[in-house]
């Protein structure tokens, strides 16, 4: 773990939250960091309201993975469409011309993050419930700068990054000690970077995979190969996403 002058250590943050004796909302992405947060919350016997946000609703490999975590933690996970889902629809991402007028007439909501937080609290918790995430300062230079500038506790928005000082080794150790297996994402995603084969890809907990995070070749190609029904589900919402595969295959000389 790291230390930054003047910033509250994550262990103290977690202990303070536990002392409040109130439920907390966990932004649960199924990624390593959010799993590590849940482990720490459970260790302190805290009541967790886990909320997952699906970039594309109804993907079976994600639903199956959420069920696995529900069984492990013995807690229901709320699964909502992500704000990115509505944003992509409103921006007509991968939409054929005949759908554009229909989508524009539907006027789907495009809530900001703070509005989304308010909706989560209104429906599943109290107005002042803390929302927790697994943002870590060592994950990237940008995140380290954000932690140094704004701190891991945002009182105005009632958000906390409660493992901000953990390194990736700390995350892996926490998950390994509990015997938790990561979802298929960590085997599938990371094989491609910017449409090219990533020869340094390594799956599993000790690898460099990642959870599903967008509709682009790096994610679409593995879903196409490993979960064809889910790939068709993506095309149901974003029909022209298939052009992403065609485009990169042409660039890479596969067709």
Name each region found by the language model.
Residues 1-255:
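Nucleotide-activated chemistry modules centered on ATP-dependent adenylation/adenylyltransferase
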């Amino acid at each position: 773990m790291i230390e930054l002058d003047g910033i509250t250590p994550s262990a103290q943050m977690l202990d303070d939250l536990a002392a409040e004796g109130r439920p907390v909302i966990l932004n649960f992405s199924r990624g390593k960091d959010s799993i590590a947060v849940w482990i720490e919350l459970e260790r302190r016997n805290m009541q967790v309201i886990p909320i997952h946000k699906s970039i594309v609703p109804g993907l079976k490999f994600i639903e199956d993975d959420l069920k696995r975590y529900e069984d492990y933690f013995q807690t229901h996970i709320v699964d909502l469409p992500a704000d990115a889902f509505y944003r992509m629809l409103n921006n007509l991402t991968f939409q054929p011309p005949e759908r554009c007028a229909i989508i524009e007439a539907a006027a789907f909501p495009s809530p900001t993050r703070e509005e989304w937080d308010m909706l989560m609290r209104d429906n599943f918790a109290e107005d002042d419930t803390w929302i927790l995430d697994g943002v870590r300062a060592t994950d990237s230079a940008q995140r380290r700068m954000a932690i140094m500038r704004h701190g891991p506790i945002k009182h105005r928005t009632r958000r906390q990054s409660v493992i901000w000082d953990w390194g990736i080794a700390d995350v892996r150790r926490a998950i390994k000690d509990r015997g938790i297996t990561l979802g298929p994402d960590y085997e599938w995603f990371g094989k491609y970077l910017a449409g090219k084969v990533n020869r340094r890809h390594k799956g599993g907990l000790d690898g460099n995979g990642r959870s599903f995070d967008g509709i682009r070749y790096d994610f679409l190609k593995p879903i196409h190969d490993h979960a064809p029904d889910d790939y068709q589900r993506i095309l149901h919402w974003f029909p022209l996403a298939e052009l992403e595969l065609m485009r990169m295959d042409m660039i890479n000389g596969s067709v």
